[in-house]
């Protein structure tokens, strides 16, 4: 009967070689790290790195030798016995039908898989330290977007909404309008209102034109009338011991001071 795998002696020999290499690695590591001042000297770190690289190559060589021995035993396997004959036909057709570059890639994948199976504990530790769950990279990947503070460009602190005391905003607006000389009503809407009133109140409005100076004069007079009316209405509301201006105050002011309107 054909031999399909390594025998017991080879497995024991391989485990013995790996154990001897690990013992030498432990002994040499203790020898390097036991030197006084090892943590503060660059030479000690360099010796330790060189030592790890050396034993890494030794462990990889052990795995490569096992792979070569498995390849040498492969021709002695009788694959024509039983159901293996069909596998032989399928395998031969698959290899011949496959392009040459794919055949080389598959061989490389087999070598890579074998090397990764016999990888040393040193490489396994390094790979675990660099994944997304441990070390610096782990802390960086674990931080969520909600933990980050988004700063506004050009500012050194986070902007906060200003809160005003009751009545402070109104006083600031009153001072702004008192100091400015601009009109309160925009000119374009007021001009449209004047033209609309002219079209509805006069039958021959299509032939009439109004100058911009006349519109400005009407706007000045209208705003002066509104300011005077609201000033008198606020006095009436203050006389009634109320702080809120209502429509009854405006109507009373019109009856008393503006009887013609």
Curated annotation (Swiss-Prot):
The lineage of its organism: Eukaryota, Metazoa, Ecdysozoa, Nematoda, Chromadorea. Cleaved at the onset of meiotic anaphase I, likely by separase sep-1. It comes from Caenorhabditis elegans. It is found in: Nucleus; Chromosome. The gene is cpar-1. PANTHER family: HISTONE H3.2. This is Histone H3-like centromeric protein cpar-1. Induction: Present at much lower (<5%) level than hcp-3 (at protein level). It holds the Pfam family Histone. Keywords: Chromosome, DNA-binding, Nucleosome core, Nucleus. Belongs to the histone H3 family. GO terms for cellular component: condensed chromosome; nucleosome; nucleus. Histone H3-like variant which exclusively replaces conventional H3 in the nucleosome core of centromeric chromatin at the inner plate of the kinetochore. Required for recruitment and assembly of kinetochore proteins, mitotic progression and chromosome segregation. May serve as an epigenetic mark that propagates centromere identity through replication and cell division. Not required for chromosome segregation during meiosis.
């Amino acid at each position: 009967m054909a031999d399909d795998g390594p025998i017991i002696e080879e497995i024991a020999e391989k485990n013995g070689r790996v154990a001897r290499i690990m013992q030498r690695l432990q002994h040499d590591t203790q020898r390097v790290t036991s030197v006084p001042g090892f943590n503060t000297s660059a030479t000690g770190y360099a010796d330790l790195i060189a030592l790890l690289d050396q034993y890494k190559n030794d462990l990889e060589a052990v795995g490569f030798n096992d792979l070569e021995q498995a390849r040498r035993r492969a021709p002695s396997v009788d694959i024509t016995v039983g159901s293996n004959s069909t596998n032989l036909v399928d395998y031969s057709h698959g290899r011949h039908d496959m392009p040459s570059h794919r055949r080389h890639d598959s061989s490389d994948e087999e070598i890579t898989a074998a090397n990764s199976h016999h990888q040393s504990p040193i490489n396994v530790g390094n790979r675990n330290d660099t994944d997304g769950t441990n070390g610096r990279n782990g802390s960086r990947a674990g931080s969520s977007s909600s933990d980050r503070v988004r700063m506004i460009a050009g500012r050194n602190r986070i902007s906060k909404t200003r809160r005003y005391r009751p009545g402070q905003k109104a006083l600031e607006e009153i001072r702004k309008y008192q100091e400015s000389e601009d009109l309160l009503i925009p000119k374009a809407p007021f001009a449209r209102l004047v033209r609309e009133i002219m079209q509805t109140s006069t039958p021959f409005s299509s032939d009439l034109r109004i100058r911009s100076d006349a519109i400005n004069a009407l706007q000045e007079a209208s705003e002066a009338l509104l300011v005077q009316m609201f000033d008198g209405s606020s006095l009436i509301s203050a006389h009634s011991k109320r702080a809120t201006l209502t429509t009854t105050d405006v109507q009373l002011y019109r009856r008393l001071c503006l009887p013609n309107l």
